[in-house]
C-alpha cells in the first residue's frame, strides 16, 4: 500500500484507479464527473416531473422555467413556426435607418439583451476586488485571433471563406436574397477588419497586469462623442459612472471608426447578423445544424 508521504494521490486513489474507466463519450472520469452526472440526472428527472404537473414548486421563477422548457421541447411547433418568431426582432433592426435611430435605442437594447455592439460590463476592480466597476472592452473578431489576419497567415483566407459560406447558407434559411446576403457579409467583413486592426491579440490579453487602464468618465467619453453615454448609463445603471476601466485601450482610442454615421451601414449589417446568430438555437433543427 502506498504511503501518503510517498505519493499522496496514489495513496488516496490507487485502488479506485485500478478499476476506473473513462466512458466512451467522456474525456475524463472521477468523483467530480460522477457528481456532475448525478446532478444532471436529478435536473432531468425533476424537470420531467414538473412538466408532467407533479410537485411543481410555488415559485414564479421556476414556474416560468417550466413554461419555457415546455416551449423549447415542442419541436413540432418549432418546425412549424420556422423563422417566424425571430422576424419581428429582425424587422426592428432592419428598420433602423440612421446612426441616430440606433443610438436612441442603445439602452433599450441593452436592457432587453439585444445586440448593440457596446462591449461594457460591470465586474470587480483589479485593485480592489470588493468594489465593482465599469469595464470597457472590445467586440470579438470573426477569426480566433488577430494574428490570423496577417496577410501571410496560412489559414486566413481558408477560414474567412468557410465563415462566409456557412453564414450565406444560414442567411438563406432566414429568407434573405442572394443580393442581401452578399451585401450583409461584405459589410460585416469590412467592420471585422477594422476591429481586428485595433483589438488585443490573445497573447496581449493574457497579460492581465497590462490591461488596467483607468479613465475618468469625462475623459473616457471623449473617445466616442457620438454615443449618448450619459443617457445610456443613467438608464442601464441608474447613474453615470465616475470612472471606467479600459482593458481594450486601442479599440476605444479608435472608437470613431465604429460609432459614427459613416460606419453605420457596416454596424447595421453586423447587428442583423448578430440577431440571426442569437436565434439559431431556438428555431428549427435545420437552422441549428447550419449554424454549426
Question: Model-derived features: where do they sit?
Answer:
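Active-site-surrounding "flap" and adjacent substrate/cofactor-binding loops of secreted or lumenal enzymes
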Residues: 2-7, 11-77
